[in-house]
Curated annotation (Swiss-Prot):
This is 3-dehydroquinate dehydratase. Substrate binds at residues 74, 80, 87, 101-102, 111. InterPro entries: DHquinase_II (IPR001874), DHquinase_II_CS (IPR018509), DHquinase_II_sf (IPR036441). The lineage of its organism: Bacteria, Bacillati, Bacillota, Bacilli, Bacillales. Its EC number is 4.2.1.10.
Length: 146
């Protein structure tokens, strides 16, 4: 059975209470449960991880290469400035799909640039929680192509 990793970055533990007009009312627990269920339907095991700490995310990305076949990553605000996370993604050989709940290109100008997207297999933005499912579908297709 394929194993995938879902990584959510800073402040995503606050889903459901943080800026519901931007991120919706769904919680991280709901998102993770829904994603695990979707993965199961595809015959895939999905492990979920969330951290507000850059180093913890980097460590998890490094460890993932030996455990998982691919990663779905929402780096949160680290998207816009974490060259360390960018370099961690670039250093691993498994595909990473970047996902964002909101359309980062329609928000504040500082959110328009992703320093991580260039080293990811793709980026999905603006589809709410459904974007994570799209990322799962895209990642599975990427793995089939390999």
């Amino acid at each position: 059975m394929k194993k995938l990793l879902l990584v959510n970055g800073p402040n995503l533990n606050r889903l459901g209470v943080r800026e519901v007009n931007v991120y919706g009312k769904g919680t991280l627990a709901t998102l993770e449960t829904d994603m695990k269920h979707e993965a199961e339907k595809m015959g895939v095991e999905l492990e979920c991880f969330q951290s507000n700490h850059e180093g913890a995310i980097i460590d998890r990305l490094h460890e993932a290469e030996d455990i998982y076949e691919g990663i779905i990553l929402n780096p949160g605000a680290f998207t816009h400035y974490s060259y360390a996370i960018r370099d961690a993604i670039a250093s691993i050989s498994i595909p990473v799909i970047e996902v964002h709940i909101s359309n980062i290109h329609q928000r504040e100008s500082f959110r328009h640039e992703s320093v991580t997207a260039a080293v990811c297999a793709g980026q999905i933005v603006g589809f709410g929680f459904y974007g994570y499912k799209l990322a799962l579908f895209a990642l599975m297709e990427k793995l089939r192509e390999a």
